[in-house]
Amino acid sequence: ALHRTTDMFGPIPYSQVGKGSFKVAYDSQESVYRSFLKELEEAVQTLDDYSNKSKEVLPAFDIVYNGDVNKWMRFANSLMLRLAIRVRFADAGLAKEYAEKAVKHPAGLIDSKELAAQMGKGAGLQMKNPLKVINEEYNDTRMGATIYSYLAGYNDARAAVYFVKNNGFKAVRCGIAKSGDAYNGFTRPNVHEDDPLYWMKASEVCFLKAEGALAGFDMGGSAGDFYNAGIR
């Protein structure tokens, strides 16, 4: 979540958080990303040390991978690859270093549908998809006019996948505040209670490797092959 936070806001409190101070300095985005990558590298090493002893850690409490340490290592490497690719225009050397570390680590990456990082099916539990909760229980999530303009303008077939089509689509202009039942007439997101909440899929990893290969990093294949694999 924090890499999305810094991508949106830039500098954020990070290195000094949780150390007992009510006033915390902001870290630069560069230092935050360097910390992210270093911490992921350390996490992979810690998991690697443990994975030689046991393949399951607290499976009853792991709603993502049922305690499978090897799968967590794949996710950590995949997340490292994501962050490395994000900084390639700001620091190509740092991006290349960590992208290649992620790809070449023997634990591997998320490279199949079955390995996707997702919440909702682990540990014998079934969570409610939070987007469904926000949509139905909070009753304030509807199709925005901006995305409708894109989808309708390009006659994009995905509109009926992203949203519930009842007698067409009706979008609300972003920034308009309505109350009570006023939202009910607008189109709802097409999400179900038992839909998994994905953190990362194999398709994203393929596209990340394609971008890395395009930048000249050693990703173990060509940009075109990885790109086509992501589409498939």
Language model features: what each stretch is:
Residues 1-232:
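Structured, solvent-exposed acidic/aromatic patches
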